[in-house]
Structures are given as structure tokens and as C-alpha cells.
């Protein structure tokens, strides 16, 4: 009985979503939107070294959503610290690339509903004896990706707490990991999944503890683009109910 009720309820939800899609303005049809992505933020968004094409969890997810919702999407790699200005300047139409929803960003853009949650972690060499307490209390060099929410949060925390470490800024999390390995910095701070991606590919690094609140990822849009947000929110709802969502998780998420 409960299984039948759940199945009936799901059918009603999908029917309502289908009716909602039909009610959306015609702007979606034959419209191409440009999605700005970080070129080196695996597994969410990156440029594939073999093909030279944008790839990743978010890239494939938005491509699926575009097809489902009746529009097309072009994924445009660009520098992360300039990606919100590019959105506001209409060089791109959205940012679906592992972008954290923050109060500061929400002042200038709107976000879709959250579609992923990820913890923030410290990363060191695999044979390092550093602990999270050591990282926060010693005058080490700590790598972060410029323009990220985790960098901004830890910088603010450092100013309040007086942590003695020195920030080293990078264009991407993988570049920070590279400098951990070659000894230019003692540790890095980043979202957990780029660290997991590096470890799964054989990098001799390890996670040494979480720090701060988890990040919630959403798609960033211009504040006035409310209809596009409706398309994307509906698209993610449909995607998460589709078997392809599990396929994406299995393909890109190493844990």
C-alpha cells in the first residue's frame, strides 16, 4: 500500500512539473545560454586534457537540464575571480560550476535552489604530521584558490582570531595541491571533492580534517533572470528524480 501511494505521489509530482514546464514562456525554446565555468575545478567543472572540451559533473548536469527544458547551453571556461563580473556584464548567462551560495554573493546575483553540499578540508602531504590545530596555530604557508568562499571565510576568521599562517593564492585547487606536493606550501584549504579527486588520481596528499561550515552549491544568475531560474530549478528537480543523476554521481564522485 505504501509503495503504491509513493509511486502515485511521484507520478503526480512529475505531472505537475511537466505542466509547469509547458507554462513557461517561450524564451527557453531555441535559446542558447552561456554557462561560465572554472577551467580547473574537478570533479565539477574542468577542461578535459585529452579532448580540450569542458567536462565535469556540473557541465554534464547542465547539458542534460538544457536538453530536458528545451534550450541549449555553451560552457565557457574563464578565470574564477572574474566570473561574477562576467555574469553581470552579460558575457555569460549563468555559473553552474561548483559555486557556493554566500550572503556576499547573493547581494549581486540570485541563486538556484541548492543542488550539492560539500565540506571544507585541509590538505597536506600524505606523510605530513600537521594537524588542523597545527595549521591554524603555526606560521606556515597555506594555499587557497583566489575568489572562493572558503578563502574569504578563512581570511575573515584569521583577522578575528589572529592565526599566524600566510595565505598563498592560486588560480585553482589543483595548483594549490601541486605546491603542497613540491613543498612550496605546507598545506591547502579547499572544498572536499577536489581533494578527493586528486587523491583518487594518485596524488600523495591527504585530508587532515574539516573546518568551518559546509558549502551549498547553486547556479548563479542575474537577479532579473527569474524565468531562467525557474527553468533551472525545475530542471534540477527532474534530474534528481532521473536515473542519470545516479550515473553522474557514480562517474564523478569518487567517495
Explain the meaning of each model-derived region.
Residues 82-85, 98-107, 153-156, 179-213:
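A ligand-binding cleft/hinge motif common to bilobed small-molecule-binding domains
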Residues 37-41, 76-81, 90-102, 118, ...:
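Beta->alpha turn/N-cap motifs
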Residues 59, 75-85, 130, 167-179, ...:
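Short helix-initiation/N-cap motifs at beta->coil->alpha
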Amino acid at each position: 500500500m505504501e509503495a503504491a501511494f509513493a509511486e502515485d505521489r511521484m507520478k503526480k509530482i512529475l505531472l505537475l512539473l511537466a505542466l509547469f514546464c509547458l507554462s513557461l514562456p517561450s524564451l527557453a525554446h531555441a535559446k542558447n545560454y552561456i554557462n561560465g565555468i572554472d577551467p580547473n575545478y574537478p570533479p565539477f567543472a574542468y577542461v578535459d586534457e585529452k579532448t580540450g572540451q569542458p567536462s565535469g559533473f556540473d557541465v554534464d548536469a547542465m547539458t542534460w537540464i538544457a536538453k530536458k527544458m528545451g534550450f541549449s547551453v555553451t560552457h565557457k571556461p574563464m578565470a574564477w575571480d572574474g566570473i561574477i563580473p562576467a555574469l553581470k556584464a552579460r558575457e555569460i548567462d549563468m555559473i553552474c560550476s561548483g559555486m557556493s551560495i554566500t550572503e556576499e554573493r547573493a547581494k549581486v546575483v540570485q541563486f538556484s535552489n541548492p543542488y550539492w553540499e560539500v565540506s571544507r578540508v585541509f590538505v597536506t602531504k600524505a606523510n605530513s604530521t600537521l594537524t588542523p590545530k597545527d595549521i591554524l596555530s603555526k606560521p606556515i604557508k597555506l594555499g587557497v584558490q583566489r575568489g572562493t568562499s572558503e578563502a574569504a571565510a578563512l581570511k575573515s576568521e584569521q583577522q578575528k582570531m589572529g592565526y599566524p599562517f600566510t595565505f598563498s593564492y592560486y588560480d585553482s585547487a589543483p595548483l594549490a595541491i601541486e605546491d603542497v606536493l613540491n613543498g612550496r606550501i605546507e598545506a591547502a584549504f579547499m572544498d572536499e571533492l577536489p581533494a578527493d579527486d586528486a587523491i583518487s588520481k594518485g596524488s600523495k596528499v591527504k585530508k587532515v580534517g574539516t573546518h568551518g561550515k559546509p558549502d551549498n552549491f547553486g547556479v548563479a544568475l542575474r537577479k532579473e533572470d527569474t524565468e531562467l531560474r525557474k527553468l533551472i530549478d525545475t530542471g534540477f528537480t527532474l534530474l534528481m528524480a532521473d536515473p542519470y543523476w545516479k550515473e553522474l554521481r557514480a562517474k564523478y564522485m569518487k567517495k
